[in-house]
Each structure stands twice: as C-alpha cells, then as structure tokens.
Amino acid sequence: MIHIEKIPNGSLQENCYIIADGTDALIIDPGSDAERIIDTIHKLNVIPQAILLTHTHHDHIGAVDQVRDAFSIPVYVHELEQDWLNDPEMNLSAQFTTIPVTARPAEFEFTLYQEYHFGKLHFTVVPTPGHSFGSVSFIFNDFVIAGDALFKGSVGRPDLPTGNLDQLLTAIKTELFSLPPETVVYPGHGDETTIAQEQKNNPYFN
C-alpha cells in the first residue's frame, strides 16, 4: 500500500511529497523546512532511497542538501536543469528571495520515459516542459506527481525563463491527459485533482 505524505512548505507553500511503500520511500521536491521533512521521515519510520526533482526553481530545491546529507541519498534531476541547482539567477532565488538558494549538483540525471525502481516503488519519468524547459512528471501506478506543470484548475506559470505556454499545454495533453481519467494528480502547489477533473474543468483546456 503506497502512502503519500504532502508537506506544504515555505512562503509559496510548495508541496514536498514523501512517497512510501513499506519502509521504502522517495522524497520529491524538498523546497524548504528541512527539519520538518526530516522529522516527518523519522515519524513515518521509512528509509528514503532518493530525492527526485520535478524542476529546479528555488521553492522546490531549498532543502535539497540538508535532506540529502541527513540520509546520504542521491538526487535526480533533468539534465537541462542540472546547472540551475547552483545558479541563483536560473533557479530564480536571485529575483524572488533575500538569500540566494543553491545546492550541489545532482548525482544522477533522468533518462526520459525510463521506468525507475526503488525497492517496492516504481515510476516513469516523462517530460512536461513549459513552466521550465527541464520540468518532468513522475507517473506511478494510479497517480502522477506533476510538479508545476498542471494544477487544480490551472497550469504552471509560462512567463519565467525558458517557459512557453504552447509547449506546456502540449506536454500536458500529450503526457498527462493520456493517463487514465481516474489518475490522481499531485501538483507542486495546492490541492490534488484528477485527470478527468482537469480535462473537464481546467479553463486552459476548455
């Protein structure tokens, strides 16, 4: 049985997710509040295997190094945004925060459309660019972690560096709307939704 723990964190209420099956766990987008994320891992009594990044804007990476070091686990990222981890201009912390956000390079870069296995957990990485050009989503059996691509009733901002609205909408229609309609969508901000709900109600597609 997969357990999904959502930890809204930071001033932008970015959703960090802990995905667990038994004692195997993955940490997705640890944006800030490292101590809270680490405490939650201990309370769940799980063993994290890796940190996965949907993209590398500052609100999704601020706790990467603290969490990585606490559990001695690797970080995975799209190759196009590997350099952004240590670049406050590209991860936008130079523009939007008082203290620049940086992290060490990720240990691994995703191979798109590959299925990854971490203990009992397995998922496929698909490209969902448009909010940023290295944005990805993680497709599990009956849910998807969509980062800042698709939100409940909206989509990610396309007006940031390397963003593109047409590319974003095409990626959502191609990679996410092709999933079963009952698939639950866990976004980078806000509440979860379903593919069917967004196909029916999202103003960007209606």
Q: What kind of region is each of these model predictions?
A:
Residues I19, T54, T128:
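Conserved S/T- and glycine-rich ATP-binding loop of Class I adenylate-forming
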Residues I7-P8, E107, P127-P129:
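Short Gly/Pro-enriched turn/cap motifs at secondary-structure boundaries
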Residues M1-H3, F118-H122:
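Conserved N-terminal entry element of GNAT/NAT acetyltransferase domains
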Residues D33-H117, P203-Y204:
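Active-site HxH/HxHxD metal-binding segment of metal-dependent hydrolases
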Residues L26-I28, L52, V75, I145, ...:
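Residue-level marker for buried hydrophobic side chains located in beta-strands
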Residues M1-L44, S137-G147:
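Conserved beta-strand hairpin/beta-sheet module of binuclear metal-dependent hydrolase folds
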Residues E14, A25, Q82-D83, G134, ...:
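Glycine-centered loop/turn positions within well-structured domains
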Residues N91-A94, H122-N206:
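Metallo-beta-lactamase
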